[in-house]
Amino acid sequence: MTDTQQKIKAVLLTVLMVTSVFAATIAFSGAAAASERGAGDSYTTGPTDGNQDNVDSAGNVGAGAVVFQGEDDIEGEFADGNGDTVGIGELQKVSGDNEGILLESPIPQDQPTGRYTANPGVEGTEGVTLQTPRITDLEIQNSDEGDVTGSILQANNDNTAEILVDYNYDEAEDLELTVEDEDGLEVTEEILADGASETVNTNVNNDDHPNPAADGDRDDSFDAGFTINPSNVDEGEYTITVEGVEDLDFGDASETATVEITTDQTASLSLDSDEVTQGEDLGFDIENSPEGNFHAVVIEESEFRDSASASNYAKVFRNVGDTSDRGLVGEDADGNTVAVAPGDADSLESIDYAYGIVEIDGGTGVGSVETQYLDDSSIDIDLYEAANGDYTDNNAHVNDINLVTDDTYETDDEQDFDVLEGDLTIDSPSGTYVTGSEVDVNGTASEGIDDVAIYARDNNDYELVEIDSEETISVDGDDTFSEEDISLSGGDLGGNDILGLPGTYRIGVVDVEDADSNSNGTVDDSLTTSEFNSGVSSAESLRVTDTELNGTFITYNGQISSDDNQIDVEGQAPGKDNLVIAFVDSRGNAVATDISVDDDDTFSEDDISISALSEGTVTAHIISSGRDNLFGDGVSDSSSGFASLIEEEYASGSSTGDQVRSRILENSVDDTASDDLIVNEQFRLADGLTTVESVNSPVEANGTIEIEGTTNRKPDDNTITVELLDDEDESVTVDSTDEWSSDGQWSVSLDLSDENVEPGNFTVEADDGDNTDRQSVQIVEAGSLEEEQPATDTPEPDTDTPEPATDTPEPATDTPEPDTDTPEPDTETEEATTEATGPGFTAAIALIALVAAALLAVRRDN
């Protein structure tokens, strides 16, 4: 290499070094002069301040700053607490599931949120907080500050609307608005109001970046907003999207809403259905009206149900949804037009219409009609134009305006719907009813029927039936009504009287609204057949029968033991709640008590004490007070009272048993005009007795002794124990029973198979705890009682003897087979040999063997 070449290379190297230093200086200077994204904890003005002049998220961040997932192009230097600094991409997560991971740069959209520092755990270390960017609220408000998000925005008179936003990333980026029409065409620039910007920020409100959320005219709970003029675009549905201007346009950082822009000034009324069952609620919506408007909906008096009261007519429009007021308009006693609430409706002399005042909220006014107060016909409902303070005051109908008769007020829309008559059924009682008995009263009702009344008819009008001291029954939410354990004849009204006598009648159910013919708010005691049938009603035939009485006393072998002195009784008494049970002995002593009848019309009473009676013949009586619930001709009106009369009066003194029984009968079933019922039985009260009636004997030592007997003791309360005793009265085995029927017959089995019993004479003893009885039994050797086989059975083996003989020739017929299968004859021959024995049989076998050998020799010669 020449000196000249070396010099040229040195010059080039110098130029490169100088250029590199210059470039580095320029780069460093550029970084130092870059716009600051913010100074973290001291940050106050936002990315659109005069110091930065940028709207996106590029720039430096300082210690303590909040950064967001998805941010790109951000830088910063952070002290590590040891005198050094690190870049943003070297910060580490302080805690949590992902502790220690690095904060990547650019920041991924799914980077775990939390605190990141240069040197976690070291005092003086610096860092940032990572959050998820979010728009937490997006609301479209009309010029009256009504929320029309997702509904209708009226475009009229160049009134502007606002798109208001709450979000958390104002330190990172501005918000950007995008508006598209229903064809997907972007119309953002067109719909923006004059002077409005398509980008905003919470912290800025100036000519370049106006923020209507900060101008004091809007709800200051919003961070930022955009001003639009709906009159700038055509009618239709528009999609509004708000998101960050650069990086933060994903997930929760972006929010979308729709709005229907219309220029139509006429509101419309839509009904949920054009046909409802009377009593069913009918919902409606008012649409195409600016947010915050108030409209009147009206149903005229001619559409009302005839039997309802004024206070109910005032409830035609339900106080639900967006309804701010409801009531009636008519004339008072002085002839003045007045609007009254339901509570004052009865003060009207005449009624013109029912009204509801409904507010447009969220683009729609929602209301509902209570159709149970309307006639079952075609009903007209009118929607009046929005009130501008002319017919409303404080969102209520003013007092001296009649919308129907005053031509000043026009309707925006009207609709009609059909009201169909509802249905009622009465499912119980049905068929037959025993007077005085308790039954369930139940049935079904159409939706909207709140209460029903029960009526009964003989030949004339329908008479009200009192149900458990009430005149009506409420309908449950599942459209059924039900009352349990009701005595239809037990009330004080005309219908109860009808059902208290045997016969065939009509029982019916009617909507309470149709049972108030004079509209006084209470059901009528009586309805004509026409009045009953013209309402929502249903009726069935019901046959009423008289009370009955059946019963029996439980005795054992016709007796009750004086050791027990207790007796049971059971039976059926339809239509009764209580009965009298009485006992009279031959000496005139009496025991009487009252018992209750169960809901299923049965009665059962155990362990009635009869210890006051003498032994001997006893008569037992079950007495019912009958249909009129009176014993005799008013002798007593209660079972307990009549029982006391029997014990304390009829059985007092020196009366005989017959005299006591006579007094019971003459004051009950035999009294004048009495409808009492009685059941009579007789038994013997005697000493306790348990006897052994039969024992099978003799019995083998491994057999079973069967013991049977009778008793007059009560089972369950007593146990009969049976023992086998040896000749020294030592117990060999024992068993017991506490079950026997009313005939007193009992039985016990003593199993000897597990007992080591020697043959001999033994005793069986039965003991009921108070009484015993014995019988002897002989035990013999096991197997000694087996019967010998009959002589006619002996020949049976002989009849089978010829069978081997008939089978014997079979080997001979098979003998030629050895030509093809030699072993088979040998097997057959051996079988025959084992089967047959006797003199000369061995010689025959030898002969057969010789013949077989000869045949084999001949075969070989051939």
UniProtKB/Swiss-Prot annotation:
InterPro entries, sorted: Csg_halobact, PGF_CTERM, Surf_glycop_sig_pep
Motif stretch (PGF sorting signal): 839-841
Segments of skewed composition (Basic and acidic residues): 206-220
Entry's transmembrane regions: 838-858
Bias-annotated ranges (Polar residues): 43-57
Annotated glycan sites: N442, N520, N550, N702, N761
Biased composition range(s): Acidic residues: 784-801, 816-833
Domain of life: Archaea
Low complexity biased stretches: 802-815
Any one annotated GO CC term: S-layer
This protein's UniProt keywords: Cell membrane, Cell wall, Cell wall biogenesis/degradation, Glycoprotein, Lipoprotein, Membrane, S-layer, Secreted, Signal, Transmembrane, Transmembrane helix
Subcellular location: Secreted, Cell wall, S-layer; Cell membrane
Post-translational modification: Glycosylated. Cleaved by the archaeosortase ArtA at the C-terminus, with removal of a short hydrophobic segment.
Gene Ontology BP term (one): cell wall organization
Function: S-layer protein. The S-layer is a paracrystalline mono-layered assembly of proteins which coat the surface of the cell.
Family named by the database record: Belongs to the halobacterial S-layer protein family.
Protein name in UniProt: Cell surface glycoprotein
Gene for this chain: csg
